Amino acid sequence: PRRVEPVREEKSVGTETTFFDTVTDREHARVVLLDQTHQCAARLRASDLRCRVVVLKARGADFTTVTRSRTLSVPTDLAHDIWETVSSLYSALPTPAGGFRLLGVRVEGLLRPDDGVQLLLGEDPRRGASERAADAVRRRWGSSALAPASLLGGGTGAARAPRGEVRQRGREDEEGR
């Protein structure tokens, strides 16, 4: 028999949203993916990890599931970098017949700073400072204290889905969403 290990190293970080009603509006789906990207990046930074692989998961109304992944040239913990990849993968993905039933973002190939992560020559050490500052604001004032404007729904029609419309899977924040 194998020994039970109560704590084990994370192999991936991700979150998924299952919709009660299928989503056919690609802009609404894009906003959901952006929110998930920020959640994943914040969890990476909180765990002092960087990722090498970004994965997009989509399930259609007929329950057909498609995953697309891309390996990054440089490991990252920044939502901006992860979003560029998620957005590119999503743009190449057609809307399934009947719409999306589930969308998810996952990052894999996790590395710790002591794993010898190589930085780019000439990389600005301040890069990512704004995301780390936003993390500090959210820790102090709650997860809804600060968000990208596109997640606020200020008249663009791309509002964050009300809590009753979705079921989230993934590690939740201390507020218990």
Language-model segment annotations:
Residues 1-100:
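DNA-contacting surface of Y-family translesion DNA polymerases
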Residues 74-177:
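Acidic, metal-coordinating catalytic segment for phosphate/diphosphate chemistry
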